[in-house]
């Protein structure tokens, strides 16, 4: 039977509950246990698919097409286990499910209430499908005290009573701020956060305390006394250089041992930390460095590109180099010459995005990379802009544009209205809802055997994750290829372009999908590993 770990957060948001959950899962995996992680998000959106990147950060897409919280990306990268639709739930989905049941008459005329109907729906989500796992870690989004989180906290309180004794453990992540004027760390915010949690009926078994400096033993004893947890269960979570140092740091502090002790598992299998130690060693002992320009449109919030950032660092791990990121807002190039920004970098990456803002700047970045022979990696929107650039400047189609921006006469990029998903034909209307109406999830692509990208993958058949409504128009394929832009990858039915590249360029590849979503520190995505390798070659020329 699965054991459950519920992870809550207090004092402030953005403390790193997702990283903590992922790190603990990795530590339990290192001991040979089978682990699943689930995220419970209190917001009323059905999913984050229509939320602004500035509000929510990245939307992480799973193989089965779920648009989920970015924390699921951490879960995948730390554990290697692909997430799915059933690993993320929101208040919006909970209420939608309940309303659908009420309309069908499933409640037999009962008054539908938060307790028991909403809490029961949450509990069903937590408990469903866990037969093959030893541990299920559930991260509760938000902060203790948030109104939106109350039904979720009540649900996990009930589960603590309903599950067999010894199969549920509560971890509370808090902040211990340092006050320079007093010259000391303060325990009071954590005390109040635990008091709030206990008033709900949840007594934390373990405190995971974030701090920017060593927590004195006297302060640990104070937290133990006033928060009613064992002193050994007050675990300090100090700031570290990279997120991949977290599992090692938490293991040294005894987090995994304390969790197993709370479950009464003694003795426990010894952990194998060698691969985490190897990743940490490579990160802290690079044999060189490269600089990659990321020409984006949400650069004000780096969380909007979380998986992309990590995938670039994975590419650095594969090549034993440090990857420095130079963030450039694409709109800058609409009024300034790109050359001063780009001529010293070793590679240019244009990531995905939506809408017209910044599009011309991304087109100019692609033009600079093509003409100057700088390694270029265009992802989703970045591939589309590279095709528009080629259509304008190589084919001579001056009005080449995307129908996403305006009803252009030359829609090199246009709205997809239908595509194959397996043996099923999926259709979308231009006037339909935004939520869940994109080409989402893993799709197959067929690569030309003699293409550069096929050599990088070592295969002509690939499966990658997509998230887009617009696609390069197949009607322009022949003219673009005649100008030198090779359509190296297509959907199996030959209708949807998946990858493009220039044969006469050291490294210029555009992909319609999002390879960053499948990159792992232990298995860097081949495209990112190859891109960083090309950047290393470029660094010798600059």
UniProtKB/Swiss-Prot annotation:
Query: Active site at which residues?
Result: 380, 514, 516
* Residue numbers binding CTP: 13, 146-148, 186-191, 222
Q: Which residues bind L-glutamine?
A: 54, 353, 381-384, 404, 469
Query: PROSITE patterns, per this entry?
Result: GATASE_TYPE_1
Which residues participate in UTP binding? Answer: 13, 186-191, 222
Which Gene Ontology terms cover its molecular function? ATP binding; CTP synthase activity; glutaminase activity; identical protein binding; metal ion binding
Q: Name one GO cellular component term.
A: cytosol
Q: What class of enzyme is it?
A: ligase
Q: Where is the segment annotated Amidoligase domain?
A: 1-265
According to UniProt, the reaction catalysed is: UTP + L-glutamine + ATP + H2O = CTP + L-glutamate + ADP + phosphate + 2 H(+); L-glutamine + H2O = L-glutamate + NH4(+); UTP + NH4(+) + ATP = CTP + ADP + phosphate + 2 H(+)
Q: Which biological pathway?
A: Pyrimidine metabolism; CTP biosynthesis via de novo pathway; CTP from UDP: step 2/2
Q: Which GO terms describe its biological process?
A: 'de novo' CTP biosynthetic process; pyrimidine nucleobase biosynthetic process
The UniProt activity regulation field reads:
Allosterically activated by GTP, when glutamine is the substrate; GTP has no effect on the reaction when ammonia is the substrate. The allosteric effector GTP functions by stabilizing the protein conformation that binds the tetrahedral intermediate(s) formed during glutamine hydrolysis. Inhibited by the product CTP, via allosteric rather than competitive inhibition.
Q: Which InterPro entries match?
A: Class_I_gatase-like, CTP_synthase, CTP_synthase_N, GATASE, GATase1_CTP_Synthase, P-loop_NTPase
The alphabetized UniProt keywords are: ATP-binding, Glutamine amidotransferase, Ligase, Magnesium, Metal-binding, Nucleotide-binding, Pyrimidine biosynthesis
- Its Enzyme Commission number? 6.3.4.2
- Annotated positions binding Mg(2+): 71, 139
Q: Where does ATP bind?
A: 14-19, 71
Write out the similarity annotation.
Belongs to the CTP synthase family.
Share any extra remarks. Answer: CTPSs have evolved a hybrid strategy for distinguishing between UTP and CTP. The overlapping regions of the product feedback inhibitory and substrate sites recognize a common feature in both compounds, the triphosphate moiety. To differentiate isosteric substrate and product pyrimidine rings, an additional pocket far from the expected kinase/ligase catalytic site, specifically recognizes the cytosine and ribose portions of the product inhibitor.
Specify the protein name: CTP synthase
Question: Highest lineage ranks of the organism?
Answer: Bacteria, Pseudomonadati, Pseudomonadota, Alphaproteobacteria, Hyphomicrobiales
